Regions:
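Short, well-structured N-terminal submotif of metal-dependent ribonuclease cores
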Residues: 1-44, 55-71, 152-161
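Active-site neighborhoods of divalent-metal-dependent phosphate/nucleic-acid chemistry enzymes
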Residues: 81-145
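C-terminal/domain-terminus segments
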Residues: 134-135, 139-141, 146-162
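A generic structural signal for short hydrophobic patches within well-formed alpha-helices
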Residues: 11, 49, 146-147
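Short His-Asn-centered micro-motif
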Residues: 6, 44-47, 140-143
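A generic secondary-structure signal
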Residues: 30-34, 74, 123-130
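Acidic, glycine-rich loop-and-strand cores that form catalytic or ligand-binding grooves
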Residues: 70-79
Length: 162
């Protein structure tokens, strides 16, 4: 199984948000390719939904804002009803995970990396630690600081394979 955690930069291109959709065609082509790969699992974190919704709320043109909000509403409904190409990851953070995020807030803020991105990074870490049999995992993002989150996971060897 190969896991891609969807970042806000990707969802903004999927929804085609003005001024945040420079890679719309490329993202849509990759999304189609990922959907066709039966070994691929797409994960949509709550932070990605919230950040994307905030970007939609700040679209200057009211008609465009409404149009993109309608697309977002449909996307959320399809996600909840298991009709989207990804799986919703809405697990709330445990106390320890929030403490880990709190330790990184200042250093990341200095580098202009917000809590939304830290939350997505935490989803990456948690998913990697709790879901067995992952071949690879990455944060699917257009942001270079998040693209660095990619790992090939070592195969778990069964006793009879030794």
């Amino acid at each position: 199984m190969h896991v891609s955690i969807i970042d806000t930069s990707i969802l903004c291109n999927v929804i085609n948000i003005p001024n945040m959709n420079q890679n719309h065609k490329k993202v849509m082509e990759e999304l189609v390719a990922l959907q066709q790969n039966k070994l691929q699992t797409l994960i949509l974190p709550l932070a990605t939904i919230i950040e994307t919704g905030n970007h939609i709320a700040h679209i200057a043109d009211g008609n465009m804002r409404r149009a993109r909000a309608l697309v977002m509403a449909e996307l959320i409904q399809r996600t909840v009803n298991d009709q989207a190409p990804w799986t919703y990851y809405g697990k709330e953070f445990e106390r320890e995970e929030l403490l880990e995020i709190s330790k990184e807030v200042v250093d990341h803020a200095v580098r202009e990396i917000g809590i939304g991105d830290l939350s997505i990074i935490q989803v990456y870490k948690t998913y990697k630690e709790t879901v067995p049999a992952i071949g690879s995992i990455r944060i699917w993002s257009l942001d270079s600081h998040l693209q660095a989150y990619f790992e090939e996971m070592p195969a778990i060897r069964r006793r009879r394979d030794r």
